[in-house]
């Protein structure tokens, strides 16, 4: 089995884009049909990229710190630099960050993107199911994160193909030791504190998938040598997600 390597957007994610993913392995093309590649432009006119995932035909879930201008979502992609017949590129009609999102502390880091048109469901494009309100993950559970980005710390270019890595759910105390703002109520701690392999600038907004359900959203970390990282806990925000998808 290949080693579990860095895949997350976790180094300074609230001030950076999602250009880098370290390690992991390339997945079978279109085997993660819920994955979304989000393009946008920041206030300085620079292109920014984030991950996300389809939760309904016209809604994508991502991280609130990914909010920018001129946002578009690409669904059904494996190679984001190729013009694949499976790809569906849809502009974002409205970005809905959580009203209590705190950029400085990285709390309530979750956002819904209302698409201008509904995605067409195909083998390469399908929503990812959300967990039930009483569902929980526990320390030791193995989950996965996927995204596009660099395959090594020294790489100068990002991988165009979708990659994935496995992470282990950690005790909340592991993240609380690193970040005083960490909340076990609204966040999940995942990685492997025994390995210098996880947090690094990469795919913000992508899903933490456990048992084929979206339990978390990639939020933040500390640097390229410290793990674990922090994920927004989807279960806590289910009422907010449901309410906003019904309103629009």
Curated annotation (Swiss-Prot):
Q: Which residues form the signal peptide?
A: 1-18
Instruction: Enumerate the propeptide ranges.
Output: 19-20
Role summary: This enzyme is probably necessary for target cell lysis in cell-mediated immune responses.
Q: Which family does it belong to?
A: Belongs to the peptidase S1 family. Granzyme subfamily.
Instruction: Look up the EC number in the record and give it.
Output: 3.4.21.-
Mention any one GO cellular component term assigned to this protein in its UniProt record: cytolytic granule
Gene of this entry: Gzmg
| Disulfide cross-links | 50-66, 143-210, 175-189
Gene Ontology process terms (BP): killing of cells of another organism; proteolysis
- UniProt name for this protein: Granzyme G
Q: Which InterPro entries match?
A: Peptidase_S1_PA (IPR009003), Peptidase_S1_PA_chymotrypsin (IPR043504), Peptidase_S1A (IPR001314), Trypsin_dom (IPR001254), TRYPSIN_HIS (IPR018114), TRYPSIN_SER (IPR033116)
Naturally occurring in which organism (per UniProt): Mus musculus
Q: Return the Pfam families for the record.
A: Trypsin
């Amino acid at each position: 089995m290949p080693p579990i390597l860095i895949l997350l957007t976790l180094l300074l994610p609230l001030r950076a884009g999602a250009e880098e993913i370290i390690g992991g392995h390339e997945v079978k093309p279109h085997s993660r049909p819920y994955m979304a590649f989000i393009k946008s432009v920041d206030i300085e006119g620079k292109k920014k990229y984030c991950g996300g995932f389809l939760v309904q035909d016209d809604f994508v879930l991502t991280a609130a710190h990914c909010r920018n201008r001129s946002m578009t979502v690409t669904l059904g992609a494996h190679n984001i630099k190729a013009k694949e017949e499976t790809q569906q590129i849809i502009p974002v009609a409205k970005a809905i960050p959580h009203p209590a999102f705190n950029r400085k502390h990285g709390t309530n880091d979750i956002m819904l993107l209302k698409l201008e048109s509904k995605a067409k469901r195909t083998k390469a494009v399908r929503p990812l199911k959300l967990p039930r309100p009483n569902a929980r993950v526990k320390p030791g559970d193995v989950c996965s994160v996927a995204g596009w980005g660099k395959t090594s710390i020294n790489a100068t270019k990002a991988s165009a193909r979708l990659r994935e890595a496995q992470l282990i759910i950690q005790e909340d105390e592991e993240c609380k030791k690193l970040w005083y703002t960490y909340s076990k109520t609204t966040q999940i701690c995942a990685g492997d504190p025994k390995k210098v392999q996880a947090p690094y600038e990469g795919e913000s907004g992508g899903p933490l998938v456990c048992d084929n359900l979206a339990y978390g959203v990639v939020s933040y970390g500390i640097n390229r040598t410290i793990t674990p990282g922090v994920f927004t806990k989807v279960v806590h925000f289910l009422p907010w997600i449901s309410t906003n998808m019904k309103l629009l």
